[in-house]
UniProtKB/Swiss-Prot annotation:
Transmembrane segments: none annotated. It comes from Arabidopsis thaliana. Pfam families: F-box (PF00646), FBD (PF08387), LRR_At5g56370 (PF24758). This is Putative FBD-associated F-box protein At1g05080. It comes from the Eukaryota. SUPFAM superfamilies: F-box domain, RNI-like. Residues 12-58 form the F-box domain. PANTHER family: EMB|CAB62440.1-RELATED, F-BOX/RNI SUPERFAMILY PROTEIN-RELATED. Residues 360-410 form the FBD domain.
Length: 439
């Protein structure tokens, strides 16, 4: 027992004699509450924690009965002495008090003064949206910023964020459209933008005009907007190479040419009727994922996707397999093709199931070029074994001369799935080297 105690003390001594800078680096890897707790270890440890450069304060969002982290946040930041803060995260839930002495702004200002590089502020408290210090919008060191929920984005005309490369705006409220425009225009090197909108965010025309932007993710999941008149998404970002647009609000779109675009995802309300200009903006992509309504797929058949290599489609409607082949005819370089019939999508609205498919279809007289000379990978998810599905699958397998793999995932609760698999295995395949896989 005595030897074990001596060994324990020796181990403690070896840690304690490390240089303070190294101890701070080690503490930066631990949760902030554990870091502060080290002050009780010894006199030397009493102040080491005050020099850490990574701070995270997060309320338990799943248990509102727990005491808010606010008091710990407020006290520990009062004692914090590091001249530089690399990262500060403050996520306050409904249990956070909303009295006048709860001042998030002063700690944001402190982080700015300490040349913060990564800042996350998420406010789910019961109070209304709160403004942040104007100094935040002129922080020269800030490279990553996340603003979420009860935050009022009120950007001064003097805003300038010369180092900001990543920005997330999640369910915030904007003072007005000018604040949004000023915010984005103040970020000359912004490369990544993630936007999740709420219904009442004070913006009708959401303008993204960022010449440096490389990746855009825009989500508007508000399908129950009462008045969507004049609501519009405007994108002018010529350097974007990855773009995801998810919008169930039926707002309109104005998308400028994106000549560098390589990867795109389009998921809009099934009632939305796109124009040619909207879809043409995505005609140069290499990889495309689309949640297709009948109107969407018909528009796509008139657009030439000359560079498209990978296509994933998620049909809303039941009667579009014939039209899909016309779309494939406009994608001569297509090598990967995925068809997925989801029964429930992110908007929480039910869509057509495979059992709703019509019984038969009319085969085209001309085989799409991509099937005869390019397609290598084909996947069908939620295959329902209806006649039209079997005919479509038969057509693809019989005409895809360079096919390497075809993967079929059967719809749940199908009767006799083993028999269906055997029937699919018996379908003729023009590519003798192709493999059939089942999930």
């Amino acid at each position: 027992m005595a030897e074990a105690k001596i060994e324990e003390i020796g181990c403690e001594d070896r840690i304690s004699v490390l240089p303070e800078d190294l101890l701070v680096v080690i503490l930066d890897l631990l949760p902030t509450k554990d870091v502060v707790a080290t002050m009780i270890l010894s006199k030397r440890w009493l102040s080491i924690w005050t020099m850490v450069r990574t701070l995270e304060y997060t309320d338990d969002m799943d248990d509102e009965s727990k005491k808010s982290v606010w008091w710990f946040l407020n006290k520990s930041l009062q004692l914090h002495k590091a001249p530089v803060i690399d990262s500060l995260c403050m996520e306050l839930g409904p249990q956070c008090p909303t009295t006048d002495d709860v001042d998030i702004g002063k700690w944001v200002a402190k982080a700015v003064d300490c040349l913060v590089m990564t800042l996350t502020i998420k406010l789910l408290w019961s109070a209304g949206p709160t403004s942040l210090p104007k100094s935040l919008y002129s922080c020269t060191s800030l490279s990553e910023l996340t603003l979420s929920d009860q935050i009022l984005v009120n950007v001064p005309s003097s805003a300038y964020l010369p180092s900001l490369t990543e920005l997330e705006l999640i369910c915030v409220v904007y003072k007005d459209e000018d604040s949004l425009v000023s915010f984005l225009s103040s970020c000359p090197v912004l490369e990544f933008l993630f936007v999740l909108r709420k219904i009442d965010d004070n913006v009708k025309t959401f303008t993204v005009k960022v010449p440096s932007l490389l990746e855009l993710t825009y989500k508007n999941l508000c399908s129950d907007v009462v008045d969507n008149t004049d609501r519009c998404l405007v994108v002018n970002a010529p350097a974007v190479n990855t773009c995801q647009i998810t919008d169930y609000s039926l707002e309109s779109f104005s998308i400028e040419d994106m000549p560098c675009l390589q990867d795109a995802t389009i998921d809009v309300d099934e009632a939305y009727h796109p124009d040619d200009k909207f879809l043409t903006s995505f005609s140069s992509v290499l990889s495309l994922r689309m949640h297709l309504s009948d109107a969407m797929v018909m528009r796509c058949t008139t657009i030439n996707f000359s560079r498209l290599i990978k296509l994933s489609i998620y049909p809303y409607g039941p009667d579009m397999l014939e039209t899909l082949l016309r779309l494939l005819g406009n994608a001569p370089k297509l090598k990967e093709f995925l068809v997925d019939y989801p029964s429930l999508i992110a908007s929480q609205k039910f869509v057509y199931n495979p059992e709703d498919l019509p019984w038969s279809w009319k085969q085209p007289s001309h085989v799409p070029e991509c099937l005869s000379s390019q397609l290598e990978i084909f996947e069908w998810r939620d295959y329902g074994d209806r006649i039209i599905e079997e005919e479509f699958l038969t057509y693809v397998l019989a005409n895809s001369k360079r096919l390497k793999t075809a993967t079929i995932s059967l719809r749940l609760n199908l009767e006799d799935p083993e028999l269906i698999i055997e029937e699919i295995k018996d379908l003729p395949r023009v590519s003798t080297t192709s493999h059939l896989l089942f999930k």
